[in-house]
Amino acid sequence: MITKLPQVLSPIQVASIIQLIEHGSFNSGKDTAGWHAKAVKNNLQWQGETELNEQIQTGIQGALTQHPQFTGAAYAKSMMPFIISESTLGGGYGDHIDDALMVNETVLRTDISCTLFLTPPQDYEGGELVMNLSGMEMAFKLNAGDAIIYPSTTLHRVNPVTSGSRKVALTWIESHIPQASQREILFDLDCARKDIMEHHGKTDAFDRITKTHANLLRQWAMT
């Protein structure tokens, strides 16, 4: 399931993050790529002082985890620290798959990948996030402050930037619900019950769907 998350960050929050980023520097991003992806990774990665990084991490992670659609789609168990990535002229990231396991304080299984856009789409050309879905490609270029989450099993790339500069924040999530198909079922049930509540109130149908949602979550969740 691919889910767009609108306005994770407000324009003021985006401007604040960009201002913090300006106090650090960008270096080659190849060091964080898996061995099979180094050859196609051509972007830059932000580095800054610990205090700056903590402010960025706190601001972005807090906004993402409080977003109502993220909560219902991800069932996040743990999350990698955000990486701030920049692609300038000619920069991008060829077709690759994200590493299945990543290490922070512990080993994290990557179930969900997340890209949070920090640059308005009109400020750069190219730079689309392109996903290969069983041979069909879908391209995404969202507004600054918007995010997209998708299964980490997805083959994807970032097209080369042909003008301007593209900045994004990236993270990977281990979910309490490892299977994407099960997360989608839970998400659909959650949306359906919220729609019933909004238009009809707490009906018998709402209670039955809520019961089913809770019991499936109980059956599938890994704690």
From Swiss-Prot:
Q: Name one GO biological process term.
A: DNA damage response
Give the enzyme's EC designation.
1.14.11.-
**Chain sites annotated for binding Fe cation:** H96, D98, H156
Top-level EC class as recorded in UniProt:
oxidoreductase
Q: Which keywords describe this protein according to UniProt?
A: Dioxygenase, Iron, Metal-binding, Oxidoreductase, Vitamin C
Q: Which InterPro entries match?
A: Oxoglu/Fe-dep_dioxygenase_dom, PKHD_C, PKHD_hydroxylase, Pro_4_hyd_alph, Pro_4_hyd_alph_FE2OG_OXY
Record GO terms (molecular function)? 2-oxoglutarate-dependent dioxygenase activity; iron ion binding; L-ascorbic acid binding
Protein's UniProt keywords contain Metal-binding = yes
Quote the NCBIfam families the UniProt record gives.
Answer: PRK05467.1-3, PRK05467.1-4
Q: What is this protein called?
A: PKHD-type hydroxylase CPS_3426
Q: Which organism is it from?
A: Colwellia psychrerythraea (strain 34H / ATCC BAA-681)
